[in-house]
Amino acid sequence: ILVVSHDVVGDAMAGPGLRYLALARTLAAHVAVTFAIPNPPVARLSAEGFPVVAYRRNDWPTLEPLARASDAILLNTDLATDFPALADLPAALILDAYDPMLSEGRAMVAAHPRDQQIGWWRERMNNLRAQWRMGDFYLCASERQRDWCLGQLESAGRINPLTIAEDPALRGLVDV
């Protein structure tokens, strides 16, 4: 599995970097992991027991060889927007929706003029629609967030009579 962090992983990390390092460590106890990070690996990461490699956001050639060599790819939903070609690969695409950027982003642009807020919102909604259509499985942080994800997936056409007949609880599509 290829685990892709969208945030710096190193000697000083914020929440996302910590989360993806923890996910890579947990998965490495069960499957072969390659960990892709958006910064040069620091020395201490060599002791993790799995390859740690750098890639650049919005630069497909830096991620493509790793993605093509993987059976599954775990990444943040926004990276799916950065790398839409992931949807064309045979690898299972696991999107991590733990960070509800729509809500956070609305707060970040609240002081901007209304037309800028609307422009940001439209772009964000277009990105979200693509993200909810391209994943094979979605992770989230809580049951409440899972409810939000289910609504997003339904509006993207991912939940329908066929998916409900196969998996009435939809845990095979989105889970905590």
Cite the ranges covered by each PLM segment.
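N-terminal subdomain of nucleotide-sugar transferases
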Residues: 1-42
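A short, active-site helix/loop in glycosyltransferases that binds the activated sugar's phosphate group
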Residues: 126-172
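Conserved nucleotide-sugar phosphate-binding/catalytic loop shared by glycosyltransferases and other
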Residues: 42-65
